[in-house]
């Protein structure tokens, strides 16, 4: 079942990184550390079990429901995030963003960061991540079928051509340098930074397309947690703290 255009996390990043324990049902997402048993995660080295239903997908290219997005919010950082306390969109993986006068072009300045495999996160990482959602001939689409969430980018210039197979890239997304991502829209949309907060629009490293099957089961992200083993359908998903995370460090390991 596809999610809404402006999906927000059931359990926020701040709560998870801070170590709040939550429960749902069936499988669980476990952040494991040196201490045994369930814990609130208030001190480093604790363990948190977060119970969720089995996700449809944990690769950004097709993350679409609450369960998948809960995993995604821990493994990946999109450009922006919704700050519930401020009631506004704020930068996350970007340092800043700005729009032109008619809200048809947005420029994002990318923070210096690393993927879990040590690769640099650049503007091209976002372009690659977005294009594999839309391109039905991408390696991941060839292996697992077209993305069901590419519509998040439907307002971007060049979307229809890439989706139809008449182009090889998303023409509305350009990378003047490694720290700058420019997005041109087909028509004005002032709330595009809100769209850019969706975890499906996270950056991906080159291995997302060069080693599709491995990435699908153990995605390599830029978020505060990284996979600890691969995802097995119907089983627990283990993650651990990413020590080289650019933002606030997790309080659980």
Give names to the regions the model predicted.
Residues 1-11, 20-28:
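N-terminal secretory signal peptides
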Residues 44-54, 105-108, 181-182, 223-225, ...:
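Short, well-ordered beta-strand elements
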Residues 95-146, 182:
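Aromatic- and charge-enriched surface segment that lines or borders ligand/interaction sites
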Residues 84, 131-139, 190, 197, ...:
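Sec-exported extracytoplasmic/periplasmic mature domains
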Residues 33-41:
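Bacterial lipoprotein signal-peptidase II cleavage site
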Residues 127, 141-205:
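Surface-exposed binding/hinge segments that line
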Residues 185-252:
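Gly/Pro-rich hinge or "lid" segments in bacterial periplasmic/extracellular proteins
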Residues 51-101, 220:
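N-terminal lobe/hinge region of extracytoplasmic solute-binding protein
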């Amino acid at each position: 079942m596809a999610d809404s255009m402006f999906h927000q996390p059931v359990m926020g990043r701040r709560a998870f990184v801070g170590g709040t324990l939550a429960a749902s049902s069936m499988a669980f997402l476990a952040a494991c550390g040196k201490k045994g048993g369930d814990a609130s995660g208030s001190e480093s080295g604790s363990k948190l079990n977060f119970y969720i239903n089995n996700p449809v997908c944990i690769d950004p290219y097709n993350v679409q429901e609450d369960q998948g997005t809960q995993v995604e919010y821990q493994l990946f950082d999109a450009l922006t995030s919704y700050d519930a306390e401020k009631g506004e969109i704020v930068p996350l993986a970007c340092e800043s963003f700005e729009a032109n006068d008619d809200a048809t072009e947005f420029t994002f300045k990318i923070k210096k960061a690393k993927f879990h495999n040590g690769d640099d996160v650049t503007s091209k990482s976002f372009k690659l991540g977005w294009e594999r959602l839309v391109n039905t001939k991408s390696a991941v689409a060839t292996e697992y079928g077209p993305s069901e969430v590419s519509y998040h980018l439907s307002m971007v210039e060049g979307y229809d051509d890439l989706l139809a197979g008449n182009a090889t890239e998303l023409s509305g997304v350009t990378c003047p340098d490694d720290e700058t991502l420019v997005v041109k829209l087909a028509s004005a949309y002032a709330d595009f930074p809100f769209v850019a907060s969706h975890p499906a629009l996270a950056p991906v490293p080159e291995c997302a397309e060069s080693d599709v099957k491995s990435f699908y089961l153990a995605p390599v992200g830029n978020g505060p947690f990284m996979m600890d083993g691969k995802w097995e359908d119907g089983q627990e998903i283990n993650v651990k703290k990413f020590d080289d995370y650019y933002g606030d460090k997790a309080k659980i390991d």
